[in-house]
Amino acid sequence: MAKKISGYIKLQVPAGTANPSPPLGPALGQRGVNIMEFCKAFNAATDGLEKGTPTPTIITVYADKSFSFVTKTPPATYLIKKAANLKSGSKEPGKISGGKIARSKLAEIAEIKMKDLNANDIEQATKIIEGSARSMGLEVTEG
C-alpha cells in the first residue's frame, strides 16, 4: 500500500548549499521533516550542478514524516542571464534594451528546460524561452 501524503512543499534551493537556516529550516520543520536528512540528500542529489544554482524543488511529505523530493531544472531567467552574462534584466523591458542574446543560445537553454516545459518539440520550447528573454528586456538576434 502507498504511503499517505501529508503535503507538498515547493521551494527554490541553491544547489549544493542546502542548510537548516531560513527559508528551508522553518518550511521543513513545520511539516516535521528531518531537516538535516533532507539537506544531506538534496546536496548529494545536486552534486553535479554548479554550486549556488537556484533549483526548484518539490518535496512530498508523508504522514509518517518521511519525504521524497524532485528537483527541476534551473529557472529560465537564471539560465538566460548566465548565457547573456547579465546580472539582471532591463529595468524597463520594451523601452530600454537590457542586452542581446543569440537565438542559438536560447535553443541550448530550451534543450535544458525541455523536460519542464509544456512543449511538444524544441522549436516550441525555444519560442517559450525567447518570450522569457524578451520579457527581461533582451533583444533576440539571429545566429
Curated annotation (Swiss-Prot):
Gene for this chain: rplK
NCBIfam families: L11_bact (TIGR01632)
CDD domains: Ribosomal_L11
Mod. after translation: One or more lysine residues are methylated.
Example GO BP: translation
Subunit structure: Part of the ribosomal stalk of the 50S ribosomal subunit. Interacts with L10 and the large rRNA to form the base of the stalk. L10 forms an elongated spine to which L12 dimers bind in a sequential fashion forming a multimeric L10(L12)X complex.
Protein name: Large ribosomal subunit protein uL11
Organism: Sphingopyxis alaskensis (strain DSM 13593 / LMG 18877 / RB2256) (Sphingomonas alaskensis)
Gene Ontology cellular component terms for the protein in this record: cytosolic large ribosomal subunit
Signal sequence, start to end: none
Highest taxon above the source species: Bacteria
Role noted for this protein: Forms part of the ribosomal stalk which helps the ribosome interact with GTP-bound translation factors.
GO MF, one example: structural constituent of ribosome
